[in-house]
């Protein structure tokens, strides 16, 4: 059984992923297509906040992820890995009440489910480094 927060993260991931192939469409509108009546009010509000936050901070998020890609560029990553990293990096930096371990564990699960056999390990390595060097100090106490 998926928790409401896991379902919310999946909705955000799916919207980010679909936006890669539907660039001319608004990211928030893509999210609305995904959010149906099975999502509760809080999950919808959280998903919308995540999408707005990712959109507003995307250049900084992408720049930060790029710093940890050895011999790779962000554009060369699979759309799955790139968008899992964007979602989780946003959550690590801006969602103060989510423990670092929860963010990374959920990102690994999404990457393993939708990515390649190496996606989970790859995402884990990048996010672990981002968390250690950039997550707010209070997140280490959750």
Swiss-Prot record:
GO terms for molecular function: RNA binding. Gene3D superfamilies: NusB-like. Keywords: RNA-binding, Transcription, Transcription antitermination, Transcription regulation. GO terms for cellular component: cytosol. It comes from the Bacteria. Involved in transcription antitermination. Required for transcription of ribosomal RNA (rRNA) genes. Binds specifically to the boxA antiterminator sequence of the ribosomal RNA (rrn) operons. Belongs to the NusB family. This is Transcription antitermination protein NusB. It comes from Thermotoga petrophila (strain ATCC BAA-488 / DSM 13995 / JCM 10881 / RKU-1). The gene is nusB.
